Regions:
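Short alpha-helices
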Residues: 90, 170-213, 226-229, 428
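Hydrophobic helix-and-loop "lid/oligomerization" segment in the mid-to-C-terminal part
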Residues: 2, 8-132, 152-153, 207-441, ...
Length: 577
C-alpha cells in the first residue's frame, strides 16, 4: 500500500427526491454518487431498461428465431476473460432452454488465436459445423473474420459492448449499446449484459410466434442466469450505473439464496466465501480472478465448462483446477511486478521524471498477466500504463490501464492516426485497452505514448489521491451502520464502496501474514476501540512504534470469524501524524 499525495473529500451534493425514511448518512453517500431520486435506488427487475431500446435487436432475434426453426447449427464465439466466459455460458444455456438443440461454443485461445473473431477462429467454427456464428463480448472490430465467415456462407450475429471503430464489420446483425446510433441509455452494459438482453428479446419473439405452445414447453425463466450476469458485470469492471446495479443485485440475491449455477457454488467454496454474506466485491476479487486465470494461463474453455456443468462434483474438480491456475498466476505476477518496479526505480535513479504514460516491456513477461501488471503499476504510480510481453514472430502484445482524465482507446487511436503502422492493431475502452506491435517498434512506441499522455493529461491528475466520504461520527461507528452500508450496495466501479477518513490514536500495531498491518485505534476525540487491518503495507516503514497518531482512510466492516461478528475497519491508507 503506497500512501497517496493527498486526501480529498467528495463534494456534498443535495439529494433531490430520496425517500424520507432513508438514514441521513445513506442520503449523503448516495447523492455524492449521482443517486438523487428514489427511482435511482430501484433494485427490482421492473426497473431494468427495456430491451426494445437496443438498436438492431429485432433483426438479431429474427436471425435467431429462423435458426431455431430451421435447426441451424449455431456456434457461440466468446472471449477469454470472465465477461466472455459468462457471456458464452449464458448464451448457450439460454438458447438450450429456449428450445435450441443445435448450439455449441468456441472460445479463442489467447496464445494461439488472439482476441476476437479472426479468420482462423472462423475456420475453427466452420470445422465444428457452424451454419451461424454469434459472437459475445467481441466482434465489433472483426472485419476480416466476418468477411471470411461470409465467404464460407456463414451469417454472423455480433453482440459486443466494446467501443466501435470508424467502420463496422459487415455482420448480418449487430447489437452494441455503444454504437453511435444506439439509443440504449446505459452505455456500460458488459458483454454478458448484452447477451442477456438479447435472450430476453428472443424469448418475447418466440412467445409471440407460438414457439413454446407449439412444442408444449414452458417459456424458461431467464432470471435463473442472473448469477452469471452479476459475475461477468462485476468482473469486467464496468461502471455500476443504475441498470447494472439492478442486474448485479438480482444476481447476488440469487446466489445468496442458493439459486446459482453449480460452477459458481464451487468457486465460492474454493474461495472460502459464504454465499449468504456475498458482496459484489467478492465477485470481483475472489471469483473473477479464478475464472480469469483459465484465459490468462491456459484456455478459457475450462472456465466455460465450469459455468455450464450441472453436476456439483464435476464443478468442484474444475474449480480446483482454476484455483491452481490462479495460484500460478499470482506467482508469475509477483515476479513480473518486481521486475517492473525495478525498471521504474532505475528510471527514477537516473534523474529522469517518470513520463505521463508508462510503456513497459520485458522479454520474459507472460502475455496473459500483463493486464494485471499494468493495473498494479498504474495504482502505484497513478498514471496510464501499458505492459507488453512477447507474442512470438517478433511481435508484442500489450495491455493498458488508464486513470481518470485519459481515454486509453482514444489515445491509441490518436497515435495510430499520427503514426500509421506504429501498431498492428488495437482496441478497448476508456480505462483499458489491448494492442499489438512489432518488437522493433517498442522503443518508438514507448517514447510516443509517453509524450502523448504528457501532452493530453492535466499534470494534477498524475498525483495520487484518495477520495473520501468524510468523517464518521462516533455514534456511526457501529455494527448496525456497518451492516447498513453492506446492504446499501452493490458497490463497484464508478459507484465506490464508502470510504471515510479521520484521526486516530494508534494503540497497537503488528505485522500479520508477512505484509499486513494489524492495528487497534481510537478516535482522537474519544470513542470506541477499533480493530483494523491495512493490507500490503511497506514493511520498511510499518510497524513504527514512534507513531502515536495517524490519519486513516478506511472502510467500516464486519469481521466474521468462527461464528463471532465484530466491528473492524479496513484501512486503505495510513499517514503518520
Amino acid at each position: 500500500m503506497k500512501a497517496p499525495i493527498k486526501l480529498r473529500r467528495r463534494e456534498a451534493v443535495e439529494p433531490i427526491d430520496l425517500p424520507d425514511d432513508l438514514p441521513p448518512l445513506l442520503k449523503r453517500l448516495y447523492a455524492s454518487r449521482g443517486v438523487r431520486r428514489a427511482e435511482d435506488l430501484e433494485r427490482s427487475v421492473k426497473g431494468m431498461l427495456p430491451w426494445q431500446q437496443l438498436n438492431g435487436i429485432e433483426k438479431a432475434t429474427e436471425m435467431l428465431y429462423n435458426a431455431l426453426r430451421e435447426n441451424t447449427r449455431i456456434v457461440v464465439v466468446g472471449d477469454f476473460d470472465a465477461d466472455g466466459a459468462t457471456s458464452t455460458a449464458l448464451s448457450v444455456l439460454s438458447l438450450r432452454a429456449l428450445g435450441c438443440d443445435n448450439v455449441t461454443y468456441l472460445v479463442p485461445n489467447r496464445f494461439e488465436d488472439g482476441y476476437g473473431l479472426s479468420p482462423e477462429v472462423v475456420d475453427q467454427a466452420h470445422a465444428r459445423g457452424a451454419q451461424m456464428i454469434m459472437t459475445v463480448d467481441n466482434g465489433i472490430s472483426s472485419h476480416a473474420g466476418v468477411d471470411h465467415a461470409h465467404a464460407l456462407g456463414i451469417p454472423v450475429l455480433v453482440t459486443d459492448h466494446h467501443l466501435p471503430g470508424e467502420t463496422l464489420p459487415a455482420a448480418d446483425a449487430i447489437i452494441n449499446p455503444n454504437l453511435r446510433d444506439c439509443d440504449f441509455p446505459s452505455k456500460s452494459l458488459a458483454g454478458v449484459g448484452v447477451a442477456f438482453y438479447l435472450m430476453l428479446a428472443l424469448r418475447t419473439l418466440l412467445r409471440d410466434k407460438g414457439w413454446f405452445d407449439s412444442r408444449g414447453i414452458a417459456a424458461p425463466n431467464l432470471a435463473e442466469y442472473l448469477d452469471l450476469v452479476a459475475l461477468g458485470t462485476v468482473a469486467d469492471v464496468v461502471p455500476l450505473d443504475t441498470n447494472n446495479r439492478i442486474l448485479t443485485w438480482q444476481g447476488l440475491s440469487r446466489i445468496r439464496a442458493g439459486k446459482c449455477r453449480p460452477g459458481i457454488k464451487a468457486l465460492l467454496e474454493i474461495a472460502n466465501r459464504d454465499p449468504l454474506k456475498l458482496a459484489a466485491s467478492d465477485l470481483g476479487f475472489a471469483l473473477g480472478p479464478r475464472l480469469n486465470a483459465a484465459g490468462r494461463l491456459d484456455d478459457m474453455s475450462v472456465g466455460v465448462a465450469l459455468l455450464l456443468c450441472d453436476n456439483i462434483g464435476e464443478a468442484r474438480v474444475l474449480a480446483n483446477e482454476l484455483d491452481a491456475l490462479n495460484q500460478t498466476r499470482k506467482e508469475i505476477e509477483q515476479g513480473m511486478q518486481a521486475e517492473a518496479l525495478t525498471l521504474c526505480e532505475k528510471l527514477e535513479r537516473s534523474g529522469d521524471t517518470l513520463p505521463g504514460g508508462l510503456a513497459m516491456y520485458h522479454p520474459e513477461w507472460h502475455q496473459g498477466v500483463v493486464g494485471i501488471l499494468a493495473s498494479r503499476i498504474k495504482e502505484r504510480f497513478h498514471r496510464p500504463v501499458i505492459a507488453f510481453a512477447p507474442a512470438g514472430d517478433g511481435t508484442l502484445k500489450g495491455s493498458g490501464r488508464s486513470i481518470q482524465g485519459l481515454h486509453m482507446r482514444d489515445a491509441l487511436e490518436r497515435l495510430d492516426t499520427l503514426y500509421p503502422g506504429l501498431m498492428i492493431k488495437f482496441g478497448g475502452h476508456a480505462m483499458a485497452a489491448g494492442l499489438s506491435l512489432d518488437e522493433a517498434k517498442f522503443d518508438e512506441f514507448q517514447r510516443l505514448f509517453g509524450e502523448l499522455v504528457t501532452e493530453w493529461i492535466d499534470p494534477a491528475l498524475l498525483q495520487g489521491e484518495v477520495v473520501s466520504d468524510g468523517e464518521l461520527s462516533v455514534s456511526e461507528m457501529t455494527m448496525d451502520v456497518a451492516q447498513m452500508l453492506r446492504d446499501a450496495g452493490p458497490w463497484g466501479q464508478m459507484f465506490p464502496e464508502p470510504l471515510f477518513d479521520g484521526r486516530f490514536r494508534l494503540l497497537q500495531q503488528r505485522i500479520v501474514g508477512e505484509r499486513h498491518l494489524k492495528v487497534m485505534v481510537e478516535p482522537v476525540g474519544g470513542g470506541p476501540l477499533l480493530d483494523g487491518i491495512a493490507f500490503n503495507v511497506d514493511t520498511s516503514i510499518w510497524p513504527d512504534n514512534g507513531v502515536r497518531e495517524v490519519e486513516l482512510a478506511y472502510k467500516l466492516d464486519i469481521n466474521e470469524f468462527r461464528g463471532n461478528r465484530t466491528l473492524q475497519i479496513i484501512i486503505d491508507n495510513i499517514w503518520p501524524i
